[in-house]
Amino acid sequence: MDILNELEWRGAINQVTDEEGLRKLTSEDKIALYCGTDPTGDSLHIGHLIPFMILKRFQLAGHHPVIIIGGGTGAIGDPSGRKSERQLQTMDQVHHNEEALTAQMKKLFGTENFTIVNNYEWLSKISLLDFLRDYGKLFNINTMLNKEVVASRLDAGISFTEFTYQILQSVDFLHLYRHNDVQLQIGGSDQWGNITAGIDLIHKVEGPDTKVYGLTIPLMLKADGTKFGKTAGGAIWLDPEKTSPYEFYQFWINQDDRDVIKYLKYFTFLSKEEIDDLAEKVEKEPWKREAQRRLAQEVTKFVHGQEAVEEAERISKALFSGDVADLSVAEIEQGFKNMPSVDVENKKENIIIWLTDNGIEPSRRQARQDVSSGAIRINGEKVDDVDAEIDPQAHFAGKFVIVRKGKKHYYLARVK
């Protein structure tokens, strides 16, 4: 399938500057294309996957993706999608974030047929006088003010620093065209003004017939109208230390039936036939949640690898069944990260006293009732003897005791 046809089918195209010209170019030749990300944090999140999935599809089709780490622009701050001025980072913060993001991108794209560059390398060499003379003269203030990214900030105010961001991004496109043969820039729908500004700059400097293009991606909204990627608990990070692979897997498996097929098209490499088959299953047997499971498997595999998928599914199965005894210490750390936890002494104790003194049961009467009725499981085993003894050293290398009350309520006791 033609790459643009595939992107259209997957719902990944919002606007293209010259679709006919881009279609002709990509059908006749392999091109270099790019998108940029500023190092505002030390990890990518799932929002970054939106443009990166486009780059990855081009890469798999034989084209050459380039990613700019905005070491220069990141020190300035992109006003796109912002209602207020960004807080400037220190250069030490910027450099730390650059290193972390670079490592994550290499994991997603590999090292073959892929380039990472840092715009600090060329932007830092432009003096103020050169900037004003060589580039400032080529930008019309009226045109810049009419760009949505600037116009939306005029009432609240925008600093000259952020106002010049689109010039810097345009310089990036020109630099990559000259030095990396880049002919296409990819960005979110809020980047349209910055992308077209870059194309205009290239046409002014290199000639009006220069073949450069821009493509933006639709704003990703959930069926309820809220923005994709935002959760009550905050961002879903690609760094496994910030969002564990289990949490990452759970995010995807919990998607709404109304959204899951759209996400399968966008965030996986499954074929049209495979996705159509899953769409039919959502229609006929939604309670099986096969589409959600496949979505979670595919995206987790892409970001964290197959081993992380298997680990996440082991944790999920154990928590559902209550059979937690075979989980590793690392799996317990992941699976119980957001569950109630208590710190307990490393000593043997009667179960009734232990449950009550550690706040898992509100009273000894309630503890006796729950234990004698079989509602309490310790490390996966039912305990119905009120005279039983808890030994914190018995399982999980003496680090944890897992308590389950009823069918759904878990507590993680961390042994001091």
Curated annotation (Swiss-Prot):
InterPro entries under this entry?
Answer: aa-tRNA-synth_I_CS, aa-tRNA-synth_Ic, Rossmann-like_a/b/a_fold, S4_RNA-bd, S4_RNA-bd_sf, SYY-like_C, Tyr-tRNA-ligase, Tyr-tRNA-ligase_bac-type
> What are the annotated GO cellular component locations?
cytosol
Motif mapping: 'KMSKS' region: 227-231
Keyword Nucleotide-binding in annotation: yes
Keyword list (alphabetical) reads: Aminoacyl-tRNA synthetase, ATP-binding, Cytoplasm, Ligase, Nucleotide-binding, Protein biosynthesis, RNA-binding
Gene Ontology molecular function terms on file: ATP binding; RNA binding; tyrosine-tRNA ligase activity
Task: Please report the stretch or stretches of sequence annotated as the S4 RNA-binding domain.
Answer: 349-416
Disulfides per UniProt: none
Q: Where is this motif: 'HIGH' region?
A: 39-48
Where does the chain bind L-tyrosine? 34, 165, 169
What role is this protein assigned? Catalyzes the attachment of tyrosine to tRNA(Tyr) in a two-step reaction: tyrosine is first activated by ATP to form Tyr-AMP and then transferred to the acceptor end of tRNA(Tyr).
Q: Which PANTHER family match?
A: TYROSINE--TRNA LIGASE, MITOCHONDRIAL (PTHR11766:SF0), TYROSYL-TRNA SYNTHETASE (PTHR11766)
According to UniProt, the name of this protein is Tyrosine--tRNA ligase
Species name for this entry?
Limosilactobacillus reuteri (strain DSM 20016) (Lactobacillus reuteri)
Gene name as annotated: tyrS
